[in-house]
Curated annotation (Swiss-Prot):
GO terms for cellular component: mitochondrion. It comes from the Eukaryota. It comes from Paramecium tetraurelia. It is found in: Mitochondrion. This is Uncharacterized mitochondrial protein ORF15.
Length: 85
């Protein structure tokens, strides 16, 4: 049995590059999703809220209201699936 020593063609290399790029994007997206729904992200949000509380003002309250609304809208499916059930 002989082992082929042919070098890969340019088309094969570009296909491999695209597959690696897609796989990398998938793993980065999955890692980002897992981080956002982990305790580390929860602690990060609590630290942000503590910072905003330290800079108490009407503008900070408006920003806090919009941040809470935005977070609920962004993770509505997550809350419905994991928190409410």
């Amino acid at each position: 049995m002989f082992v082929s020593l042919k070098l890969p063609t340019k088309a094969a290399l570009s296909k491999l590059f695209l597959q690696c790029k897609a796989l990398r994007g998938f793993f980065l997206k999955e890692a980002n999703y897992n981080f956002q729904h982990s305790w580390l992200y929860f602690i990060f949000v609590l630290n942000q809220l503590a910072y905003m509380r330290g800079n108490f003002s009407v503008i900070a309250l408006r920003e806090l209201k919009w941040e809470v609304k935005r977070a609920f809208d962004r993770y509505r499916y997550f809350f419905k699936k994991h928190v409410y059930t």
